[in-house]
């Protein structure tokens, strides 16, 4: 899981999971039914027209991901996501549909989701969800299959604008679209089992049975620096195509740097590009998507 910023609030360690976060920080008790579902088929039908050619270059997705069946991993992720929401709800930490911040996030999602099939055709079939969990932890994620969650800490502590929130959502969605979790789990399991990509592709079995048990790993999965850079750039373009100012990607990570004391701590640095390098990469790519943003704003 891309714990977007493996950050810790000042004087208070970030809990290892959202359930622990909810219990530790004692958020206001919320009631209300669990969040909404967006039918990806309908969303794709209303997708805004745009250039099919990506403006940022991230190369091809890893072939290793083929070792894990996408359908199996997505089903496992859906089960884990449902359990997580149920736990949050039992602790009064799941935002109801009427919560203003949740409505804001879903409005952003409604603009981003129709554009996602340009990066992964499977996204047309995903049943997207966006939910909000009460926790001081600075975090957000998107599981395989389009299951998104934000923690209130990332909204409240960073004082995010809509453009900045869209950059975070785009980044997390990009991890799912580029199937980073699928690739990382496949590499890990294949290595531990002594399997080669060639042997798998020649029909010597898949990791399907293992994938069915991978849901619990998704909440602690750490992506590589390459994965993080890909997610930054794909998320940048996705948000720009939806009409969100790409300059917000820079201001977002400047805020992240300040929130983490300028470094982010060992856990952050182990899986993310350093702050200055990340910002420079984004700054170099903003001009490539600026035209997409301006076109989207013109309607």
Protein language model regions, located:
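A Zn2+-metalloprotease active-site environment signal
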Residues: 2-299
